[in-house]
Curated annotation (Swiss-Prot):
Biochemical pathway: Carbohydrate biosynthesis; D-glycero-D-manno-heptose 7-phosphate biosynthesis; D-glycero-alpha-D-manno-heptose 7-phosphate and D-glycero-beta-D-manno-heptose 7-phosphate from sedoheptulose 7-phosphate: step 1/1
Family: Belongs to the SIS family. GmhA subfamily.
Self-association state and partner proteins as the record states: Homotetramer.
Spans through the membrane: none
One GO term describing the cellular component: cytoplasm
Cofactor section: Zn(2+)
NCBIfam families: gmhA (TIGR00441), PRK00414.1 (NF001628)
Source organism of the structure: Sodalis glossinidius (strain morsitans)
Ranges for domain SIS: 37-194
More info: The reaction produces a racemic mixture of D-glycero-alpha-D-manno-heptose 7-phosphate and D-glycero-beta-D-manno-heptose 7-phosphate.
Name this protein carries in UniProt: Phosphoheptose isomerase
Record-listed E.C. numbers: 5.3.1.28
Length: 194
């Protein structure tokens, strides 16, 4: 009954992935981000990640697989998703939702840490504020965006952009693939240079 729709959805996902894969800049940005994070861990720094909605789930997934595990057993890596419900509700209530991530970065971020901001539009005001707070703390910044990068375009040390202009779920599908590859590369880099 729905088999044609299922095939169509999978083919659209495949096409989005093939379009992303066809541009070497995307491959390089994933490698650059992985090296930046691995170098941060080697220097004693940590990763803070943030996003809204599905991107919030991706930020938590990223931190969880860094602190827990991906494919192989290895030591946990220092990563925190800005996702504590009491922090989010307190700051949203007292200061406004636009400050939920920046307040956390101001409190916990240190020079040499990395902020990973995830936004399919590249226009999330609370992530833009977090980027500003990270810069003020001397942190490096990686963003995962979509479309033309939005207001975040050019704001990061590394941007992994999915140039898809349809529904956001296609961008999120590439984001989670990029996140899994990042973790794989980080693990290889950490083992290779111990």
């Amino acid at each position: 009954m729905y088999q044609d729709l299922i095939r169509n959805e999978l083919n659209k996902a495949l096409q989005t992935l093939q379009n992303f894969l066809s541009d070497e800049r995307h491959i390089q940005s994933i490698e650059d981000a992985a090296k930046l994070i691995a170098d941060t861990f080697k220097a004693g720094g940590k990763v803070l990640s943030c996003g809204n909605g599905g991107s919030h789930c991706d930020a938590m997934h990223f931190a969880e697989e860094l602190t827990g595990r991906y494919r192989e057993n290895r030591p946990g890596y220092p990563a925190i998703a800005i996702s504590d419900p009491s922090h989010l509700s307190c700051v949203s209530n007292d200061f406004g939702y636009e400050q939920v991530f920046s307040r956390y970065v101001e409190a916990v971020g240190n020079k040499g840490d990395v902020l990973v901001g995830i936004s399919t539009s590249g226009n999330s005001a609370n992530i833009i504020r977090a980027i500003d707070a990270a810069r003020a703390k001397g942190m490096r910044v990686i963003v995962l965006t979509g479309k033309e990068g939005g207001k975040m375009a050019g704001s990061a040390d590394v941007e992994i952009r999915v140039p898809h202009f349809g529904y956001a779920d296609r961008i999120q599908e590439i984001h989670i693939k990029a996140i899994h590859i990042l973790i794989l590369l980080i693990e290889k880099e950490m083992v290779a240079q111990g």
